[in-house]
UniProtKB/Swiss-Prot annotation:
CDD domains named in the record: Chorismate_synthase
Record's catalysed reaction(s): 5-O-(1-carboxyvinyl)-3-phosphoshikimate = chorismate + phosphate
Cofactors named for this entry: FMNH2
Biological processes per GO annotation: amino acid biosynthetic process; aromatic amino acid family biosynthetic process; chorismate biosynthetic process
UniProt name for this protein: Chorismate synthase
Amino acids binding NADP(+): 48, 54
One example GO MF annotation: chorismate synthase activity
Span of the signal peptide: none
Gene coding for it: aroC
Amino acid sequence: MSGNTYGKLFTVTTAGESHGPALVAIVDGCPPGLEISLADLQHDLDRRKPGTSRHTTQRQEPDEVEILSGVFEGRTTGCSIGLLIRNTDQKSKDYSAIKDLFRPAHADYTYHHKYGIRDYRGGGRSSARETAMRVAAGAIAKKYLATQGIQVRGYMSQLGPIEIPFKTWDSVQDNAFFSPDPDKVPELEAYMDQLRRDQDSVGAKITVVAEGVMPGLGEPIFDRLDAELAHALMSINAVKGVEIGAGFASIAQRGTEHRDELTPEGFLSNNAGGILGGISSGQPIVAHLALKPTSSITVPGRSIDVDGNPVDVITKGRHDPCVGIRATPIAEAMMAIVLMDHLLRHRAQNAEVKVATPVLGQL
């Protein structure tokens, strides 16, 4: 099975299944000397882990990460960093009734056709459980980026039909939804409570922002920074769309509105989302992710079995009624991994490039 590694100079490889004994990751290319601790990684893992509120899956996984290699006396050595998280709360019997059935909107049908064999327990490799290792690896990237003045953070900007206006970063860590508007939290809670009573699920929109990124990151033509971000963010489970900057709203904009004019004091807008011609402009990099509703619900759905016979499928087990609630740390991790990789690639080729033109901020 290919496709388990992302990056060229800063690479992240993951392995493991939802109900296997453990999840693992190998992070390669991190420069030596970076101060890193278990607490650095655990902070983001605790933000993503299941069972932290009544609005997420009740699977209880501590997601305690172990560093197996690449760190000595609290600093990276420049060697491969091995990471491990043990699975502790699998209930595989919940899935025995559907081992020969294909759950609608899941990867069951496509994995079956591609490989001829699949781990049906909790979705196996296709489960969002895999993203725990991305978050652990992304924490390393975030720690290094911080030494370069780069900060990556995200928030939920929509849950189902409820749009969430951005008010303050201070609110994001104070509620289960990563909502930047504290006044919206009661409405979000009421909506999710009703959704559980309906035994249904809903989608969400996540916004992730990187500030402090210098101009110059991105490798035209095929490795444009926005293309790489779209690739990485689309690889997250349940993501069905990615926008950079104004995204699809730019369709209705006129050129006089969309163009981000430059002044000696800074850019006048950021419709480009901090990327021009596939290269970072120095403005905040802004991406939006659309996540589909969770496919695992107890409302019967029509499908077929492995022999092609019609069946009704009811998915048991413990699932998130909205996967977007826990997606913010995952989106942050993937953006950080992309920026880390491109920072090292830019440094390798263009470290000696100097221009007299000032770096503009955004007004």
